[in-house]
Amino acid sequence: MSHNAMEHWKSKLSKTSTSTYVLLAVIAVVFLVTIRRPNGSKGKSSKKRASKKNKKGKNQFEKAPVPLTLEEQIDNVSLRYGNELEGRSKDLINRFDVEDEKDIYERNYCNEMLLKLLIELDSIDLINVDESLRRPLKEKRKGVIKEIQAMLKSLDSLK
């Protein structure tokens, strides 16, 4: 654009009233709102979509999940330790290099996950359980805790 054309537009803009700018802004907002809203929608579309999603979800999962028994909860933690972290931690212990940042990250990760499992075991409440059932559950939980603590001790020795 030449300098004269620029001056021409500047003079036109300076003569334009504020109400014109406000009117243009309102038109722009209405235009944007119209574009974003689906055709024929009066604001109820999100509710309709949500109810359709809920209907689909109800058909897929009609039954609520059954809570795990206390023994299953302990077994679950034990299996997760055995399947996910025990081998991974042992492998790390065998090849650990203090200078390797990946090994340090892996050690910290395993440490955090093992602590998470300990917290999960700690949250299993055995207080209101019948005494005949409580003893074996406590022993089982104690055994898993000792395994995890031994691994944590081994990982801590890598520092």
Swiss-Prot record:
GO CC, alphabetical: endoplasmic reticulum membrane; mitochondrion; nuclear envelope; nuclear membrane
Assigned keywords, A-Z: Chaperone, Endoplasmic reticulum, Membrane, Nucleus, Signal-anchor, Transmembrane, Transmembrane helix
Mode of membrane association: Single-pass type II membrane protein
Coiled coil ranges: none
Principal subcellular localization: endoplasmic reticulum
This protein's record includes keyword Membrane: yes
BP term (GO), one: protein folding
Signal peptide: none
Localization terms from the record: Endoplasmic reticulum membrane; Nucleus membrane
InterPro entries registered for this protein in UniProt: BAG_dom_sf (IPR036533), BAG_domain (IPR003103)
Segments crossing the lipid bilayer: 13-35
Additional comment: Present with 3346 molecules/cell in log phase SD medium.
Subunit structure: Interacts with the HSP70 family members SSA1, SSA4, and SSB1. These interactions are strongly reduced by ADP and ATP.
Record protein name field: HSP70 co-chaperone SNL1
Organism of this sequence: Saccharomyces cerevisiae (strain ATCC 204508 / S288c)
Lineage, top ranks: Eukaryota, Fungi, Dikarya, Ascomycota, Saccharomycotina
